[in-house]
Amino acid sequence: METVTIVFRVMMYILVLLVLYYLYKFLYGDSWAQKDIVVYSASSHTNGMPSNNSNVTTLTTSVPQIYPGGEYSISTWMYVNSWTTAKNKPFFTLSGGGGSFKSLVLFLGQRTNKLGVRISTTSGSKLNAAEMGKITSSSPMAPYTDNDISMCDIESVDLQKWVNVTVVLMGKTVDVYMDGKLARSCVYGTTFDADGNTPTITLGGPDSFSGYIGLTRAANFAYSPDIVYSHYQQGPFAGFSLSSLNPFSYDLTLSSNGSTIFSTSNE
């Protein structure tokens, strides 16, 4: 009889745990789970997303939830054809979907070759509509002019090649990686901010640079350096190999019994 009682109690404990688990799933879904999602994928250089489309590309499906002061990572690829000098060129934004402000904005400078990396903080400045207007104005206003170099900005971006940009948000800390390597690590006075519960990413648009945007992903956790480099190795589109970053620096040679039967080399 005592054995039956023990078994019954164990079964009841398991049942209670299952009920609590499914209740939590019902209330909160799987937002607690780590997600690393490809939100935009380009299959080749020729059909990568033209960055300066007439309309902004808005992505909401499968974008992981973002919380103020938590952890979040984004990785995107860009191919800059040329540096136009009309104005700043925002090409990536991340927001919580509330509509009040952007959590993260990436833009290229007006006349100076630089990558602007700006965030909203909980008790500091917000990237609201007025601030976004300062960025995209034909006469950019402080703190978004070419002379305004934020602690997270990158002062040089390679042209006419695919470049990977990864930004990792961790509370007050922002890490910026270029082509898989840490380029900037900066600490703000307060944590990054986010509003709403429909996380949204926008890519390109009429104010963006002349070129292409490749594979873009987002994660609700902080990428480690190994993950950043692994994503860089995967490249900007499906079927990618590292040689495609600079295809003219590689030769293809086919040989049979020691004799060359085909070669792309000019030698």
PLM features: residue spans?
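Extracellular glycan-associated modules
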Residues: M1-E267
